[in-house]
Amino acid sequence: MSAEYDLTIIGGGPVGMFAAFYAGMRNARVQLLESLPELGGQVQALYPEKIIHDVAGYPAIKGRELVAQLEKQLTQFPIDIQLASPVTDVTGAMGDFTITTASGQQSHSKAIIVATGSGAFEPRRLAVDNAAEFENKQLFYHIPSVKQFADRTVLVAGGGDSAIDMALMLEPVAKHVYIMHRRDRFRGMEHNVDLLKASSVEIKTPFLIKQLAETATGQLQLTMKEVRGTTEETLAVDDLIVNYGFIADNKVIRNWHVTPTMAHRLITVDTEMNTDVPGIAAIGDTVTYAGKLGLIASGFGEAPNAVNQLMMTLYPERRSPLHSTTVFEKM
């Protein structure tokens, strides 16, 4: 049986979407499989309102807007997109891989690019006994829109770029914003930290939340304890947003019959994004190699590399890739 697709991209986050588009430019028969009901991966599911500053050509763009632009880019080619289709198994070999999804549907592909990001993800939850009582009421781990916090007092817990970005996004919308971190120094990029310090966001360091309670007026009362100290403070807020990061795992890949070698839950690749399984490449946050940066911008560079090396392996008689202007002049 001949393979239905030249390339199957497993993972429909921004990097997987760009890989599918670029494969379309190479006239490949492309399938894009995404486990979630919509494209965009973690950016769409967790950070739709986050302002992204490190994508070339965009001084600033919201996560959802970046995904929308990538979707628009995809429509230029006949990409077969399958949503809500987590891949449960891969069998076969280069030239005819069989890919099985959770619904039992099978497809055949000559080669595969894995772009599953960090895999399945769960937020690192607040380690307070009664925290679950307040989840999705006054305690949030990710939010669909900052508008829900208009004219409210909000505390953001966390010390990385995501927490800082969230606090800065809330600043013009909320009545008052606090940010609390367990260390005196934030882990975010220097420019973001400078913006935070220059903003009206009130900084609480070095503190950890120890207790949650509801006040008589319906607010959320936080009891905060100084790290390596004895000071305790209480603070009443309308909402608490916890940005402690996510616990991610690509364990589903380890259950495939054809499994690339992994190191610390990430797939190891060479300079051409090849795994140790012929015909399977991997890109984005799912991979590790010397000098790897966990940036969307890095993944956008890895995608054409992976597509080109697989297409040249499958179709050595084809010409080397052309510049995009040449491709679109013919359309």
Curated annotation (Swiss-Prot):
Binds 1 FAD per subunit. Its EC number is 1.18.1.2. Gene3D superfamilies: FAD/NAD(P)-binding domain. SUPFAM superfamilies: FAD/NAD(P)-binding domain. Keywords: FAD, Flavoprotein, NADP, Oxidoreductase. Belongs to the ferredoxin--NADP reductase type 2 family. This is Ferredoxin--NADP reductase. It comes from Lactiplantibacillus plantarum (strain ATCC BAA-793 / NCIMB 8826 / WCFS1) (Lactobacillus plantarum).
